[in-house]
């Protein structure tokens, strides 16, 4: 028995050593891509392998600068509400005074820094949603944290002043700003917020060490100021297609049938559609777990169900661990559809900006590295023939047309007369010289991808969740346990030889903390309930991401089979 246990630990050790070698290679490659300015390759790395924590403050600004949803934005509005029955908009402007909004902001931001002193207070605070009123017994913050709150307030107010016609303040903006400040310094320096430990700002490179010789190769200044970065991030997180326009197009294209064929599982829908799709997929993929979660009491509008607000509208802000949320945001910020298909996903767009994107990487990303991050040479959310369709073309304007074509192509008696297929080897947009490798572009809207990532998280924890009571399930959704603990520990100790050789004279470094695993007694636990530390729950996020792709294919194949005869 002892020999077997030793063998298992030895296997895990060498697997982890191999993983750390790969992560060092990833750091080196990302630094090289930053130096040559290959934003297309950086986006590919972000959505497939994730950006190393040490480098997000350099990469996220580049990804946001060229993100399609930033170049041509359209956000879900909480001031304009579309009435599909009467085909008109209803406007609900902000009625709070600026002082009231500032007070609410200060209250929301202040919660980040206050430690929870009891289970009751913690659960109550975690469940509070965007409409929570200011108040409570929160003690005054230290001066340093007050400065952070004031800076973030100013940043959010700038966004609201610019987008006031479409969006008024809600708590999600505060927690998105806080989450961004966990990776991108407010002042352009190196200090970031610590995450779930509710402490003062920490030096990023003390948390995730990076040798001086590597740091010297990185840009000294950021692409954007923090408030500019925040605005661009919010444009991605709150993105929404033009729903009235999409419905009109679907109605026009489906005039041969009596049923409106609006089902944007590829191009993406609004927040309501995302929630509906989540529960539809949930009922098919995890039917046993779906029952307790979809119980009438669980879904009744209350503080318990505000996890849906944080998961879907805020893309994991507040309820996910710092490391896991950042990895999820890597996939959001790295999202890139094929340049020819931009308008299929951005149905409101009137700009011409496909020239910003290349279909091939620079020579800095070679074939060997490419096959490490894309083992099968395509997007994680692939489906047979989907990447060969010219989405948005004359015959493929709507999702239902794309799905119908996929059904037709995947039938056994498929004929040869197919719609336009775009060749795989089509070079670089605007260039005759081929270089690097061909980029496998994103095929699903990024917020639809999130649904399947969330489903993979639930599948990974299914058996434990089935044992939980309703209150424990609610706690899980409002405080998701760490998903990539092993990866985070590796990045914290990636250059441990260099750390050990450094002088320990600086009291700020506190090197002993660098080797403690996240979630140890040194930090405030994120979950009040124990979900286990087994190997399955501590896998790399890459495994979870690939599982999400598998779930997508399983679900959409069943959907196509069920609707093949309609």
Curated annotation (Swiss-Prot):
Gene3D superfamilies: Ypt/Rab-GAP domain of gyp1p, domain 3 (1.10.472.80). Its main location: cytoplasm. Residues 50-336 form the Rab-GAP TBC domain. InterPro entries: Rab-GAP-TBC_dom (IPR000195), Rab-GAP_TBC_sf (IPR035969). Keywords: Cytoplasm. Residues 120-140, 500-522 are annotated as: Disordered. GO terms for cellular component: cytoplasm. Residues 123-139 have a biased composition (Low complexity). It is found in: Cytoplasm. Belongs to the OCA5 family. This is Oxidant-induced cell-cycle arrest protein 5.
């Amino acid at each position: 028995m002892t020999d077997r246990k030793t063998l298992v630990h030895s296997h895990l050790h060498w697997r982890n050593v191999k993983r750390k070698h790969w992560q060092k290679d990833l750091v080196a490659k990302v630094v090289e891509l930053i130096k040559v300015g290959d934003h297309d390759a950086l986006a590919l790395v972000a959505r497939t392998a994730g950006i190393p924590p040490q480098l997000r403050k350099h990469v996220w600004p580049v990804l946001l600068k060229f993100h399609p949803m930033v170049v041509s934005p359209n956000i879900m509005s909480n001031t304009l509400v579309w009435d599909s029955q009467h085909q008109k908009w209803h406007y609900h402007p902000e009625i709070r005074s600026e002082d009231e909004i500032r007070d609410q902001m200060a209250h929301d931001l202040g919660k980040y820094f206050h430690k929870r002193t009891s289970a009751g207070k913690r659960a109550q605070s975690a469940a509070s949603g965007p409409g929570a009123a200011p108040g409570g017994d929160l003690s005054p913050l230290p001066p340093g944290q007050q400065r952070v709150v004031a800076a973030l307030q100013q940043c959010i107010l700038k966004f609201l002043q610019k987008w006031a016609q479409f969006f008024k303040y809600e708590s999600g903006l505060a927690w998105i700003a806080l989450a961004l400040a966990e990776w991108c310094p407010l002042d352009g320096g190196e200090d970031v917020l610590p995450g779930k430990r509710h402490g003062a700002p920490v030096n990023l490179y003390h948390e995730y060490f990076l040798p001086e010789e590597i740091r010297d190769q990185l840009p000294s200044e950021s692409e954007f100021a923090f408030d500019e970065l925040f605005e661009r991030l919010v444009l991605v997180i709150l993105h929404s297609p033009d729903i009235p326009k999409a419905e009109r197009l679907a109605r026009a294209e489906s005039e041969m049938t009596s049923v409106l064929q609006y089902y944007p599982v590829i191009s993406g829908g609004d927040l309501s559609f995302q929630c509906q799709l989540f529960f539809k997929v949930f009922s098919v993929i995890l039917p046993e777990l779906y029952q307790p979660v979809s119980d009438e009491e669980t879904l009744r509008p209350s503080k318990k169900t505000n996890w849906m607000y944080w998961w879907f509208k805020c893309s994991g802000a507040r309820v996910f661990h710092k490391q896991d949320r950042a990895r999820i945001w890597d996939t959001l910020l790295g999202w890139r559809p094929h340049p020819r298909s931009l308008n299929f996903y951005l149905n409101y767009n009137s700009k011409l900006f496909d020239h910003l994107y290349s279909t091939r990487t620079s020579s800095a990303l070679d074939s060997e590295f490419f096959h490490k991050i894309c083992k099968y040479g395509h997007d994680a959310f692939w489906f047979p023939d989907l990447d060969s369709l010219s989405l948005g073309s004359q015959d493929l304007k709507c999702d239902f047309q794309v799905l119908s074509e996929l059904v037709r192509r995947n039938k056994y008696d498929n004929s040869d007369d197919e719609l336009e297929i775009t060749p795989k080897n089509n070079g670089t947009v605007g260039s005759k010289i081929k270089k690097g490798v061909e980029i496998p572009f994103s095929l699903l809207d990024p917020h639809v991808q999130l649904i399947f990532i969330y489903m993979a998280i639930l599948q990974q924890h299914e058996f434990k969740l089935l044992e939980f009571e309703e209150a424990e399930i609610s706690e899980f959704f409002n405080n998701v346990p760490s998903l990539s603990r092993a990866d985070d520990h590796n990045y914290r100790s990636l250059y441990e030889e260099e750390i050990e050789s450094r002088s320990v004279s600086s009291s700020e470094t506190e090197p002993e903390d660098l080797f403690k695993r996240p979630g140890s007694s040194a930090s405030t636990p994120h979950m009040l309930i124990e979900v286990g530390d087994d190997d399955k729950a501590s896998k790399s996020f890459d495994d979870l991401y690939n599982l999400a792709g598998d779930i997508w294919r399983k679900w959409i194949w069943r959907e196509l089979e069920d609707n093949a005869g309609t």
